[in-house]
Amino acid sequence: DFHFEAGRTYKIRIEFVNDRRGARVIFGYSAGWENFSAAVEAARKADVAILCMGDNEETSGENFDRTDLNLPGRQLELVQAVYATGTPVVLVLQSGRPVTANWENDHLPAILEAWFPGEQGGTAIAKTLFGNAAPGGRLPITFPRSVGQIPCHYSRRPGGGKRYVEMDWLPLYPFGYGLTYTTFAYSDMTLSRSVIGPQDTVTVSVTVTNTGKYTGDAVPQLYVRDMFSSVVKPERQLAAFRRLTLAPGESRRVELTIGPKQLRTLGPDYV
């Protein structure tokens, strides 16, 4: 790393040997970390601090390998410095990968995963944070606590052990996880039948009630597990889901139907 002073001109010579196909030179610079104190002071005077952290095209994308899944660089240091002011912190993650946000999860009151949201992402994030829209998405991947848990996809096959020496074996955020500005209760679940044939379907019905103070989207999810398969099957598989918007106090009956397509298995003879 080289330090460049403002107002001075520097001559830079780069020597590069291309010893493999597809090699390239990337020249860039960092604005430095002198604004840490300015950010901390601004947060100290604010009612709420919104920190947008995460990746860009240089740190996350196709054909990128990583040795850790933490926030890049010194981003966590900035988050911790702002948190130390006592001002409530909302963390907006913009990333194309899971983040091992253990400290952030334990200390911050709100985390919004925005992924790489595109040119109108700022508008969508602002509407969500200011209450004009309620978050309703559910994670399509699993967020591990550490790279040592990888692979930790939700549909993993049964293994011998579920314990680590230094941490919980459960992921930080499981597949299908997600919060919104309200709460929901599920009750009166019933099955249309208890036994089905090879070509039959079964419908699971459940009542979903918005028990909070705000309108929000509930996402009932139905998972299946084969307890007596002739081949090793995942511990659970997503078979069906619905997304519905409920006003405060509103209840609705939801039906999720599954059949041979969701329950079939490729046998040991590939039939």
Q: Where do the protein language model's features map onto the residues?
A:
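Acidic/polar, compositionally biased interaction segments
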Residues: 1-48, 57, 65, 70-75, ...
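Structural beta-sheet core signal
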Residues: 14, 51, 91-93, 141
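Secreted, periplasmic, or luminal enzymes acting at the cell surface/secretory milieu
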Residues: 94-217, 223, 268-271
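Intrinsically disordered, low-complexity Pro/Gly/Ser/Thr-rich segments with frequent PxxP/GP/PP motifs
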Residues: 230-270
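Hydrophobic beta-strand positions in extracellular immunoglobulin-like domains
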Residues: 16, 208-210, 258
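Loop/turn elements at helix/coil->beta-strand transitions in domains of secreted/extracellular proteins
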Residues: 44-49, 85-90, 107-109, 135-137
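Solvent-exposed, conformationally flexible loop/turn segments
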Residues: 7, 198-199, 246-251
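Short acidic, flexible loop segments centered on an aromatic residue
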Residues: 213-230, 236-238
